[in-house]
From Swiss-Prot:
Intervals, Periplasmic compartment: 293-300
Stretches in topological domain Cytoplasmic: 1-271, 322-327
Membrane topology annotation: Multi-pass membrane protein
Naturally occurring in which organism (per UniProt): Yersinia pestis
Protein function: Zinc transporter. Acts as a Zn(2+):proton symporter, which likely mediates zinc ion uptake.
Compartment annotation: Cell inner membrane
Family of the protein in this entry: Belongs to the CorA metal ion transporter (MIT) (TC 1.A.35) family.
Lineage, highest ranks first: Bacteria, Pseudomonadati, Pseudomonadota, Gammaproteobacteria, Enterobacterales
Reaction it catalyzes: Zn(2+)(out) + H(+)(out) = Zn(2+)(in) + H(+)(in)
Gene giving rise to this polypeptide: zntB
One Pfam short name: CorA
Name of this chain's protein: Zinc transport protein ZntB
Main location: membrane
Length: 327
C-alpha cells in the first residue's frame, strides 16, 4: 500500500480514530500523521453515519470490492485476501441493552500492515476492551496483535455465553427431575440461541484457523500461535454447543412425555369419575321418566331410601374399581 497520511483519515463522525504507537499505547490521528507498519492507523466507523458512509464509498485507500462489505453487506464470518490487504468479517455476542445475546453483533475489518478500518452498527464490546488496553498502555503494538486481541475478546464473550446456556440447561434438567415443566417458549428460545450461535461460530473458528496458518505479512509467529490457541478454544466451545443441542432435544422429548403423562392422568381420572357416576345417572334418568308415577313417591322415606341406594351404588362401583386395580 502507498503512504497512508492522517489527512486522508479525517472522518468527523468516526467512532474511534487512533494511531498505535507500537508500544501498547495510542494517539489521536492528526492531519500530519503518517501510518507505518510499526505504527498503524486504526479507524473505527459506524457505517450508518453519513460522513462515515461517504468516506467508505469515496476513499482511495479501500479497494472497490471492500466498500460494500464494510458498509454492512457481509454477515457470515469469512476472510478474503485482496492484494496486500485482507477483509475479515467476525460475529460477537450482543451485550447491548434491549437485545438478546443470540442477536449477534458484526464487526467488519479491512487490514493492511499500515491501516486498520473496522466498521459496525451495534456496539461491539470487544472493541472497547482493546481500546481500554490501549488507553492504559498495555494494548496491541501492531495490526496482527490488534486482530488477535479482538479475536480473543470475541471468543471470551462467546465462551461465557455458552457457559450461561449450559447452566440454563442444567437448571431445566433439575426442574424436570422434580416434574416441573418450563414456561412456554423457554425451551424454544434456548434451542434457537444454541443453533444460531453454532451457525456463526463454526465458520468463525475456520477464519481463526486460516489466520493462524496463512503467512500474512502483518502477523508474526507469536500472533499466529495465539490465533491458533483461540481457534482451538472456540472449537471446544463448538463441541459444548453440539452437546447442548443434543441435550435440549432430549429435554424437549422429556417435556412432551411429561405433558402427555399429565394429560393421560387427567383423562383417566375423568373416565373413572364417569364410571362411578354412570349407574347413578342411569337410575336418576330412569326415575325421572315419570311414566305411571315415580316409584316410592307415596312413601315418606322414599327419597331418603333412593339417596341411600345411590350412595351404596357409588361405593360398590368404587370398591369394584379398587379391587380391579383401576383406582
Amino acid at each position: 500500500m502507498d503512504v497512508v497520511e492522517g489527512k486522508a483519515l479525517q472522518v468527523s463522525d468516526a467512532v474511534y480514530a487512533y494511531q498505535l504507537d507500537g508500544k501498547g499505547g495510542m494517539t489521536a490521528i492528526s492531519v500530519d500523521a503518517v501510518a507505518s507498519a510499526t505504527q498503524p492507523c486504526w479507524l473505527h466507523l459506524d457505517y450508518t453515519y453519513p460522513e462515515s458512509a461517504e468516506w467508505l464509498q469515496n476513499t482511495p485507500l479501500l479497494p472497490e470490492v471492500v466498500r460494500d462489505g464494510l458498509a454492512g453487506e457481509s454477515m457470515r464470518p469469512k476472510i478474503t485476501r485482496l492484494g496486500d490487504g485482507t477483509m475479515i468479517t467476525l460475529r460477537g455476542i450482543n451485550f447491548n441493552n434491549d437485545a438478546r445475546p443470540d442477536q449477534l453483533v458484526t464487526i467488519r475489518v479491512y487490514m493492511t500492515d499500515k491501516l486498520i478500518v473496522s466498521t459496525r452498527h451495534r456496539k461491539v464490546y470487544s472493541i472497547d476492551n482493546v481500546l481500554n488496553d490501549l488507553q492504559s498502555g498495555t494494548g496491541p503494538t501492531g495490526s496482527g496483535h490488534w486482530l488477535v486481541d479482538i479475536a480473543d475478546g470475541l471468543t471470551d464473550h462467546t465462551s461465557e455465553f455458552i457457559e450461561d446456556l449450559h447452566d440454563k440447561i442444567i437448571d431445566l434438567e433439575d426442574d424436570l427431575m422434580e416434574q416441573k415443566v418450563p414456561p412456554r417458549g423457554q425451551m424454544a428460545l434456548l434451542r434457537k440461541q444454541l443453533i444460531v450461535l453454532r451457525r456463526y461460530m463454526a465458520p468463525q473458528r475456520d477464519v481463526f484457523s486460516r489466520l493462524a496458518s496463512e503467512r500474512l505479512p502483518w502477523m508474526n509467529d507469536d500472533d499466529r500461535r495465539r490465533m491458533q490457541e483461540i481457534s482451538e478454544r472456540l472449537g471446544r466451545g463448538l463441541e459444548d454447543l453440539d452437546g447442548s443441542i443434543a441435550r435440549t432435544a432430549v429435554l424437549s422429548d422429556e417435556i412432551s412425555s411429561l405433558m402427555a403423562d399429565a394429560m393421560n392422568r387427567r383423562t383417566y381420572t375423568m373416565s373413572l369419575l364417569a364410571m362411578v357416576f354412570l349407574p347413578t345417572t342411569f337410575l336418576t334418568g330412569l326415575f325421572g321418566v315419570n311414566l305411571g308415577g315415580i316409584p316410592g313417591n307415596t312413601d315418606a322415606f322414599g327419597f331418603t331410601i333412593f339417596c341411600m341406594m345411590l350412595v351404596v351404588l357409588v361405593l360398590s362401583v368404587a370398591w369394584w374399581l379398587k379391587r380391579s386395580k383401576w383406582l
